[in-house]
Amino acid sequence: MSNHTHHPKFKTLKRAWKASKYFIVGLSCLYKFNLKSLVQTALTSLAMITLTSLVITAIIYISVGNAKAKPTSKPTTQQTQQPQNHTPLLPTEHNHKSTHTSTQSTTLSQPPNIDTTSGTTYGHPINRTQNRKIKSQSTPLATRKLPINPLESNPPENHQDHNNSQTLPHVPCSTCEGNPACSPLCQIGLERAPSRAPTITLKKAPKPKTTKKPTKTTIYHRTSPEAKLQTKKNTATPQQGILSSPEHQTNQSTTQISQHTSI
């Protein structure tokens, strides 16, 4: 408590405690004079004052404890976050060069194999393969290039020509009959027309033609019963004539022969 005696809230609490002491002394004097109603009201007010003072002291202690704990917790969080921010550095070209030179020095220090019989020298095949692997590992960083935009590689002249070809009208020459102003436009359109790949159109197989046979139309005539009877009679009479026709023909032939003889 000695550290917090200079705090302004503690000073107010001390003053309130002193005032409460004086208040208690005054109440005891009133009780001696048999003034019970005044004593009861004073006791209730004193109880309220003590409760509020206790609540205020508890709040002060909690706030002071939090203020002390906050500065101690901040450095710990910073210390834990610092190692997370550090990322491992990529190997630089200098490290690759140093490793490459060290491997070359080791390969040069080893003497080549010499055949005493033929006098020929043979290098170490294992060292050659190792050198090739080291070179293949060290080259990618040096040979890496930034991606080049295809738009930047094209010169600006091509864009201008393309724009000109689009703006000029393309007129077919078949429509320029008798128009002298149309003929130069027709030629310019053919020269400046943008070159495009020919479009291949697949021809569809023709559908087989189906010939529809004409349908016979039957006409039905309404016939009365009287007409039906007449047709039946007509059909009956020719049959009789047909049956009697050979005899009749023979009779006619005989009559004709007799006439010729009489003449």
Curated annotation (Swiss-Prot):
Residue ranges with Low complexity bias: 72-92, 100-110
Extracellular side: 67-263
Region entry Disordered, spans: 69-166, 223-263
Segments passing through the bilayer: 38-66
InterPro entries cross-referenced by the UniProt entry: G_prot (IPR000925)
Residues bearing glycans: T72, T80, T87, T92, S105, N127, T139, N163, T199, T215, T231, N251, S253
GO cellular component: a single term: membrane
Protein's UniProt name: Major surface glycoprotein G
The organism of origin for this protein: Bovine respiratory syncytial virus (strain A51908) (BRS)
